[in-house]
Amino acid sequence: TVHKEEIDKGQFIIEYEGGHKGISIDDLEEAGYGRRPNCRRCKLKVPRQADLACGNWGVIGDKAGKATFVEVCSEKGAMLLDEAVKAGVLKTEAPNPKGLEIRGKVENAMYKLADKWRKHDFEGLGTGRDRLAKIVKETSRCIKCYQCIDSCPICYCVECSTKKPYLVKPGELPPNFMFQLIRFAHIADSCINCGQCQELCAMDIPNALFMHAQQVELEKMFGHVPGIDMSLPLLALVEEREERDRLAATGSDQIFDIFK
């Protein structure tokens, strides 16, 4: 019977009745197991955009496995922690300096590992027309079940453009590539790499990989970090009347009416 699972010092460890067994997490992931692909690429290892970040990095010595490292990231988090201590439900103490050093080293090591996986996954997509051809081929399996859209925390449009018949023809499978282009155009700059669009895809299309690869490129271009930077991303707000006037003034019939 398995009692506990954890990742510690580069090992995936299973504790069972009478002992434990560990295997290199690198070996596991090279073989296609281990963490989800999007988690491997993630560089947000300590969620400092939250009020409190809790984990075991930095907990050492006799407290290892028995205590939690709590990093206070906001005034609200500090107040919550103080109130818990006052209520007697929590006991705190200053972190061990050695533990802080180890915590920093572990976090930096995980950043490097994330960079390694990004390089591995993104280079596998190719560039330019080769990347586009790969995405078109992979998404040709799409059955338009809408799991990628319904599960996306960023996609919250009241009226979804992928359901407009003049953009995506009803009843056609696979849907024309406009279906995918709409998703990329709406989500790519704000993708937080949660992986749900890939996790729930009935046809095993690597949607999260495609979206994350585009998000990283857009982040390099515009500097917006989704999930961290709370300012509005580029072109987040458009005044409809002014935009209509601008489009009309171009005199081009190649400009699509985005308000239709």
PLM feature spans:
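Iron-sulfur-associated redox domains of electron-transfer enzymes in respiratory
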Residues: 1-143, 149-153, 161-162, 176-182, ...
